[in-house]
Every structure is written in C-alpha cells, then in structure tokens.
C-alpha cells in the first residue's frame, strides 16, 4: 500500500462500508458515504468562492460534524485547513486572518469586514452541485493551527507534512482501524484536531462532544464502545471527583487507550487512574504542535519510572543543555532540546514568528528537565512563563497587552497560580487608577481575549511591575504569592 490523499482515504472508506457511522455529534450522525458525498459538494462550493490548491481556509466553527466537513472539503481542493476558536474576539481573529491571508473564512466572524471571502456557520451548498468525486489533490500542508506565542502576538504553525498518509505501515499513537474514538476537547486545539482526524482516516467512528462534561464522557464511552480517547489532566480530575455511585456505574471495558497530554498530570491523579483502569490502558504523550519530537509512556512504565514522560518516538533526538548551551550529562537538569529526524524545518514553519534554537537545528519547547541513564525524559519546570490551564497554553504577554490597552491601567503582570482543578489559573496583577473597577477591567478584556484567557483573579498594586530594563519578573512575582499563601495557611 502506498501514500493516499485524504480525499482518496475518505472515498475508499465510503466505498468499503458506506453505511457505517463516520461522525456523531449530540443527536446527529453521518455515515461514511454521506460524509464523502457532502464534502464533495461542499468542496465545489468552496471552489466556486475562489479556493484553490495551496490556499488556506480559516475554519472558525465549534465542535460539530460541520467542522469535519469543512476540513475535508478543504483537503479535497488541495488547500490547508487553518482552525481557530469560534469564540475568538474580533481583535484576535483579525490578527490571525491577516497572517494567514486565507482564501475563505468559514464560521464565526463571517459578518466582520475582514477583507476575505466568508461563509457563515451552518452554510448549506447548493443541492444542484454535484457530489461526484473530484480530481485527486494533495494539500502541501495538512494543517496550520495557531498559537498565542510568547510575544503575546499570534502565530500560525504550518505543518510540513502533506495531506497524504499510508497507515498500512504506521498507525499513529496506538490507534486501530474501524474502532470508535471519543473527542472531548476543542477541535481548534492541535491534539484533538490531529488525533481525531487520524482516527477518522483509520475508519474510526468519531464521537465528538460539544464541550467536555465529566459524566457525559463516561456515558458516551459506554454507549459507543469507545476504544481510544485523549484528555487533559483537568478532565481526568473532574471525572475522578464524581461521586463513586456515578463514576463507577458506567462500563468502560471497551476503552483500550486513554491518552493524556498538554499539561503535567499530578502524580496522585495518575495513580488513581492507573488503579482504576489499569496501567496498560493509561498513556501519556509529551510534545509540541511543531512536531519536532514527542515522548510516550504507558502507565505500567510510569510506575517503574515515576514522574517520567517517556522515551522519544520516531527517531527524534533529545539533549539537555545549560545556559551556555553545553550538553549536560544524564540526571542533570537543564533546558530540553529536540531534533526531528529530518532536521530543523522538516516538520513545520511559522507564519508570524521566527524559529530559534541551537546550532544543528535543535529546538526547545521551553521546558526544563533531565534524561536518565535509560533514556527516559523527566520534566521539572517551565523555562518560560507560559501558563498551562486545563490543557490550554496561555501566554502572559498576550493578556498583559490586552490589560494595558485600558487607558486607566499603568502596568500589569500575569502569572499562573497553582490550581487543583485546572493545574494553573490566570492571575492578573494590575497597577491602575482607583477609578477602574475590577468589573470594568474584566468587561474590557472580554472584547480582546478568548474567555479561557481572562484572569480568574485580579490583584491591585500601586508599585511598578517592570524593572528599569522594562522587564516583568513574573517568576519572582509568582514565588512571592506562593510564599504568601503558605504563610496564610
């Protein structure tokens, strides 16, 4: 078997088992044949609006069957889907659209004057358009997700992997053919997007949730005989905290792989899940959207190497260096650098940012840690100030930039305070005029930031938050507040 385009993969699945379910969402479901035919028609509608091979299509849709249809229609034209949150504020959406320069924007924001062709959510193509197969095309880049970036400005991470795959040789992340996969996370995030699309291409029945709900997740696993799913630790925590009479009443025997990623998992929580489901069913992945390298570890391995995130996959290399860029021996903590098999630039390129790293193409995800003598990687801390809240990457500079746009704000600093549920919660420290109330500031931020980025707590100060060099020492601010909390307790 050789590489096949995404269009051919979807078409072959439809021919093999046309009536099998492809995607389910809430009370709606679509078969493989319906998915293939509807996306042929939708692709023709997109083409009529000017989408061509090599273009980007920005997709601002919530979790839904429609989201998958928009992506597949884009691939069938040889274009690249560029997913974003359907709830992005106008300022953020304009910034991303200006970077991507898409041929088409689908979904939220279609009513804004963004200077690009747009389609609203729930768009239905003309039924007179043909649903026959289109000429086979391969997208040059199969995906282009976004990131806030440590500078506070958005960037687009364009995958260098083309839109064609050969799963006969390598099935990703222990996924199997013709199973069922649950998607509880937002599809504009790289993990849910990539892994659920891989599952779809493998013939999995994709069961996508509108939003995560702890008990509903368990009910869907039982109802659809879910084989594979991924979660972030916040989801795991909320499920574990359900009353036993709820958590234990559902049959989870079909669940073969539960993969967690995107944020550190508290050891106590991981142990509870291993005790509950078994170490052979709990898996962890560490890596970045850039695809420069990833690790994998099973629950059983983790018990033998407690705290590790596993060994490198797929021929990638890892090294740990000190501040001078010198490679450290096993067991010594430093900054973690990864090198993909094809070298720097082989897995992605940025729009809106520049890649950086060490000589030879080694790149860092901003994590500190060490490698043991057996090649297991351990994380100790973040080098940067990025906040990990509920599995989402949140960049303080972006929130500070939004806060500082208010005319009554003098300066601000944003840090991530420890949070039992989310891992970290966004805390804003603000030096502002007394006339500015917290309520007014929060209202201001709703116009500039996605909801999950808005601070959960605000602290008022009357001292400068930047040093003479104009830098904010967030790590020092965080240590002070953690120490204060310990003194109070």
Model-predicted segments: where are they?
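Gly/Ser/Thr-rich phosphate-binding loop
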Residues: 145, 201, 227-228, 244-305, ...
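Conserved pre-ATP/AMP-binding loop-to-beta segment of ANL
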Residues: 3, 18-19, 123-146, 153, ...
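Conserved AMP-binding/adenylation subdomain of ANL enzymes
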Residues: 165-180, 188-227, 242
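Conserved ATP/PPi-binding loop(s) of AMP-dependent carboxylate-activating enzymes
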Residues: 312-315, 326-358, 392-394
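AMP-binding/adenylate-forming catalytic core of the ANL superfamily
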Residues: 221, 229, 368-453, 465, ...
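Conserved structural elements of the adenylate-forming
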Residues: 36-41, 142-143, 155-178, 184, ...
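Conserved beta-loop-beta connector loops within the AMP-binding
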Residues: 317-338, 370-374, 434-438, 472-474
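Conserved AMP-binding/adenylate-forming core of the ANL superfamily
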Residues: 2, 21-52, 56-64, 89-94
């Amino acid at each position: 078997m050789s590489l096949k385009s995404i269009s051919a993969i979807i078409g072959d699945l439809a021919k093999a088992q046309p009536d099998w379910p492809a995607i389910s969402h809430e009370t709606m479901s679509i078969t493989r044949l319906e998915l293939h035919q509807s996306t042929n028609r939708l692709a023709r509608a997109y083409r009529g609006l000017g989408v061509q091979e090599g273009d980007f299509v920005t997709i601002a849709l919530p979790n839904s069957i429609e989201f998958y249809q928009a992506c597949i229609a884009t691939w069938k034209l040889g274009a690249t889907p560029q997913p974003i949150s359907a709830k992005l504020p106008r300022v953020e959406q304009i910034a991303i659209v200006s970077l991507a320069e898409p041929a088409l924007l689908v979904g939220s924001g279609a009513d804004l004057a963004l200077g690009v062709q747009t389609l609203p959510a729930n768009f239905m193509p003309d039924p007179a358009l043909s649903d026959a197969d289109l000429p086979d095309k391969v997208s040059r880049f199969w995906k282009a997700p976004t990131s806030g970036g440590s500078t506070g400005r958005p960037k687009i991470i364009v995958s260098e992997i083309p839109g064609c795959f050969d799963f006969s040789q390598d099935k990703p992340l222990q996924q199997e053919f013709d199973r069922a996969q649950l998607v509880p996370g937002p599809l504009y995030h790289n993990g849910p997007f990539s892994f659920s699309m891989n599952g779809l291409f493998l013939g999995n029945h994709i069961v996508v949730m509108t939003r995560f709900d702890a008990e509903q997740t368990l009910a869907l696993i039982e109802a659809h005989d879910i084989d594979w799913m991924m979660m972030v630790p916040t989801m795991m925590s909320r499920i574990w905290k359900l009353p036993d009479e709820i958590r234990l009443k559902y049959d989870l025997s079909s669940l073969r792989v539960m993969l967690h990623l995107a944020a550190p998992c508290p050891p106590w929580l991981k142990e509870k899940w291993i005790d509950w489901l078994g170490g052979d069913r709990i898996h962890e992945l560490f890596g970045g959207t850039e695809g420069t390298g990833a690790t994998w570890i099973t629950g059983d391995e983790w018990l033998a190497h407690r705290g590790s995130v596993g060994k490198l996959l797929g021929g990638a290399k890892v090294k740990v260096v000190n501040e001078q860029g010198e490679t450290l021996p096993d067991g010594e903590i430093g900054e973690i650098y990864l090198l993909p098999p094809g070298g720097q630039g082989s897995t992605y390129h940025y729009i809106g940012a520049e890649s950086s790293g060490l000589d030879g193409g080694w790149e860092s995800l901003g994590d500190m840690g060490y490698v043991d003598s057996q090649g297991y990687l351990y994380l100790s801390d973040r080098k940067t100030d990025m906040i990990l809240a509920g599995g989402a990457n949140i960049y303080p500079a972006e929130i500070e930039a939004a806060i500082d746009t208010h005319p009554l704000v003098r300066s601000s600093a944003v840090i991530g305070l420890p949070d039992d549920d989310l891992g970290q919660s966004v805390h804003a420290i603000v030096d502002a005029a007394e006339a500015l109330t917290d309520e007014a500031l929060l209202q201001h931020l709703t116009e500039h930031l996605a909801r999950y980025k808005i601070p959960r707590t605000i602290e008022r100060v009357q001292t400068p938050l930047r040093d003479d060099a104009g830098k904010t020492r967030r790590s020092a601010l965080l240590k002070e507040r953690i120490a204060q909390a310990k003194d109070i307790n």
